[in-house]
Amino acid sequence: MSEFIKPYNDDPFVGNLSTPVSTSSFSKGTSRNLPAYRRGLSPLLRGLEIGMAHGYFLIGPFDKLGPLRGTDVALLAGFLSSVGLIIILTTCLSMYGNVSFTRADSKDPLQTSEGWGQFTAGFLVGAVGGSGFAYLLLANIPVLQTAGLSLFS
């Protein structure tokens, strides 16, 4: 096993291990295509794409595992709860950006206060839109509403 796992770039002081999974071309290609690492993406579009994914998957746990599960208003309560959490997350992202990025001369636009503000705005719009899209899918397609019930009952 020691021939497979070795220090990254043969430098034991880096603190990162080079494994067959972490150094494979598939893993590197997959992580390069994530919006956080994709080159040439503006902060607004980066936030929009990350927000859509988060908003889309946040509604499920609130709907199926929330205190109103099994009631007629569970889906609406799940949607409103996910929007509430999205607003809290957006507030936290905004506070982080105001405190962390004070320089305006960074080469990466996401590392500036203005770029982080665009990212946060994109995140808010994308997350509320993703959560709304998931709500509309679950409200109008009954098969999706009952698909996961066997997992939680």
Swiss-Prot record:
It comes from the Eukaryota. Disulfide bonds: none annotated. It is a multi-pass membrane protein. Its main location: plastid. It is found in: Plastid, Chloroplast thylakoid membrane. The chain crosses the membrane at residues 73-93, 119-139. Keywords: Chloroplast, Membrane, Photosynthesis, Photosystem I, Plastid, Thylakoid, Transmembrane, Transmembrane helix. The keyword Chloroplast applies. One of its GO terms (biological process) is photosynthesis. The keyword Oxidoreductase does not apply. GO terms for cellular component: chloroplast thylakoid membrane; photosystem I reaction center. Belongs to the PsaL family. This is Photosystem I reaction center subunit XI. It comes from Pyropia yezoensis (Susabi-nori). The gene is psaL.
